[in-house]
Amino acid sequence: MTNIRKTHPLIKIINHSFIDLPTPSNISAWWNFGSLLGICLIIQIVTGLFLAMHYTSDTSTAFSSVTHICRDVNYGWLIRYLHANGASMFFICLFIHIGRGIYYGSYLYSETWNIGIILLFTTMATAFMGYVLPWGQMSFWGATVITNLLSAIPYIGTNLVEWIWGGFSVDKATLTRFFAFHFILPFIIAALAMVHLLFLHETGSNNPLGLISDSDKIPFHPYYTIKDLLGLCLLILLLLLLVLFSPDLLGDPSNYTPANPLSTPPHIKPEWYFLFAYAILRSIPNKLGGVLALVASILILAIFPLLHTAKQRSMTFRPLSQCLFWILVADLITLTWIGGQPVEHPFIIIGQLASILYFIIILILMPITSMIENKMLKW
């Protein structure tokens, strides 16, 4: 009798995806983050489900319901902080996963890459709407500022913003619909992740050398299941350190003040994982220009396959491109720092220079450097 693992219609799919999957023998720890993102998504859906059982999406009770979860529900504080800090871990894994894709040229699998960009946008939308739900000061003002950006769209902008708000300001209708969307989107993310995996398995995984590895493949299980398990242990350790020792480290203190439309916080800023984009938005002294730069800063990922001028896929043997890549990483860290600072000298000019550098590195310096390296190969 043939193994049920290989014959059963459903188990067969799981087998081909996670057990008998032929995998390059040399993929490094940077390839762990895909599975970690899957784990993060599961953690977020499970903790989110338990939070939704006790949360009320009404402006008069939302803030109190979060307090009730933390004080009265059994281990409610744990569930709430696992969910909040789980989002931070999610984005750390996401940024490393994208960085790995850029470094090793994984973006040349264009279908997988494009689904990944859609996943990034969907995850960012979900996180933004989730941040509004506790209905603290930063929730309310963050929602007001970010949704207001849509009013920069010519002709339809104002109508669009009022349609999203469900009124003339962020209010009950906005909170209710944000809760509904925040609940449904993670399941859409899960479906998209399956499509992402489907496209990846059409081509097989890339590897650190950027070479075709068909001649040297090993089964995913047990080699990479045990490796992913180590990554999972480290992820859980980091998450628990954060949750149990300093759960509010990455949050904003003003979100412990109930939302008040009559008093604006001195510095409105989003969660840390949006600060780089927020800094780019703020560095342009024009509303529409800022919004376009904000969208472009993420959408620029879509043209990476077109900007690939190198003869080698991976940056492993391209030292000049490696230097540029790490300058880009440093630039993004600088933008993240600037996004959390007040709009005053010298932060304004630093933010503007970092924003310009971000686009120059990706659009101009990286393709030119690759061409120079191509020439150096001929020497």
Swiss-Prot record:
<dbReference type="InterPro" id="IPR036150">
    <property type="entry name" value="Cyt_b/b6_C_sf"/>
</dbReference>
<dbReference type="InterPro" id="IPR005797">
    <property type="entry name" value="Cyt_b/b6_N"/>
</dbReference>
<keyword id="KW-0479">Metal-binding</keyword>
<feature type="transmembrane region" description="Helical">
    <location>
        <begin position="113"/>
        <end position="133"/>
    </location>
</feature>
<keyword id="KW-0472">Membrane</keyword>
<dbReference type="InterPro" id="IPR027387">
    <property type="entry name" value="Cytb/b6-like_sf"/>
</dbReference>
<dbReference type="GO" id="GO:0046872">
    <property type="term" value="F:metal ion binding"/>
</dbReference>
<feature type="transmembrane region" description="Helical">
    <location>
        <begin position="347"/>
        <end position="367"/>
    </location>
</feature>
<feature type="transmembrane region" description="Helical">
    <location>
        <begin position="77"/>
        <end position="98"/>
    </location>
</feature>
<keyword id="KW-0812">Transmembrane</keyword>
<keyword id="KW-0679">Respiratory chain</keyword>
<dbReference type="GO" id="GO:0008121">
    <property type="term" value="F:ubiquinol-cytochrome-c reductase activity"/>
</dbReference>
<comment type="function">
    <text>Component of the ubiquinol-cytochrome c reductase complex (complex III or cytochrome b-c1 complex) that is part of the mitochondrial respiratory chain. The b-c1 complex mediates electron transfer from ubiquinol to cytochrome c. Contributes to the generation of a proton gradient across the mitochondrial membrane that is then used for ATP synthesis.</text>
</comment>
<feature type="transmembrane region" description="Helical">
    <location>
        <begin position="320"/>
        <end position="340"/>
    </location>
</feature>
<feature type="transmembrane region" description="Helical">
    <location>
        <begin position="33"/>
        <end position="53"/>
    </location>
</feature>
<keyword id="KW-0349">Heme</keyword>
<feature type="transmembrane region" description="Helical">
    <location>
        <begin position="288"/>
        <end position="308"/>
    </location>
</feature>
<keyword id="KW-0813">Transport</keyword>
<feature type="binding site" description="axial binding residue">
    <location>
        <position position="182"/>
    </location>
    <ligand>
        <name>heme b b562</name>
    </ligand>
</feature>
<dbReference type="InterPro" id="IPR016174">
    <property type="entry name" value="Di-haem_cyt_TM"/>
</dbReference>
<dbReference type="GO" id="GO:0006122">
    <property type="term" value="P:mitochondrial electron transport, ubiquinol to cytochrome c"/>
</dbReference>
<keyword id="KW-0830">Ubiquinone</keyword>
<dbReference type="InterPro" id="IPR030689">
    <property type="entry name" value="Cytochrome_b"/>
</dbReference>
<feature type="transmembrane region" description="Helical">
    <location>
        <begin position="178"/>
        <end position="198"/>
    </location>
</feature>
<feature type="binding site" description="axial binding residue">
    <location>
        <position position="196"/>
    </location>
    <ligand>
        <name>heme b b566</name>
    </ligand>
</feature>
<comment type="similarity">
    <text>Belongs to the cytochrome b family.</text>
</comment>
<keyword id="KW-1133">Transmembrane helix</keyword>
<dbReference type="InterPro" id="IPR005798">
    <property type="entry name" value="Cyt_b/b6_C"/>
</dbReference>
<feature type="binding site">
    <location>
        <position position="201"/>
    </location>
    <ligand>
        <name>a ubiquinone</name>
    </ligand>
</feature>
<dbReference type="GO" id="GO:0045275">
    <property type="term" value="C:respiratory chain complex III"/>
</dbReference>
<dbReference type="Pfam" id="PF00032">
    <property type="entry name" value="Cytochrom_B_C"/>
</dbReference>
<feature type="transmembrane region" description="Helical">
    <location>
        <begin position="226"/>
        <end position="246"/>
    </location>
</feature>
<keyword id="KW-0249">Electron transport</keyword>
<keyword id="KW-0408">Iron</keyword>
<feature type="binding site" description="axial binding residue">
    <location>
        <position position="83"/>
    </location>
    <ligand>
        <name>heme b b562</name>
    </ligand>
</feature>
<dbReference type="InterPro" id="IPR048260">
    <property type="entry name" value="Cytochrome_b_C_euk/bac"/>
</dbReference>
<feature type="binding site" description="axial binding residue">
    <location>
        <position position="97"/>
    </location>
    <ligand>
        <name>heme b b566</name>
    </ligand>
</feature>
<keyword id="KW-0999">Mitochondrion inner membrane</keyword>
<dbReference type="Pfam" id="PF00033">
    <property type="entry name" value="Cytochrome_B"/>
</dbReference>
<dbReference type="GO" id="GO:0005743">
    <property type="term" value="C:mitochondrial inner membrane"/>
</dbReference>
<keyword id="KW-0496">Mitochondrion</keyword>
<protein>
    <recommendedName>
        <fullName>Cytochrome b</fullName>
    </recommendedName>
</protein>
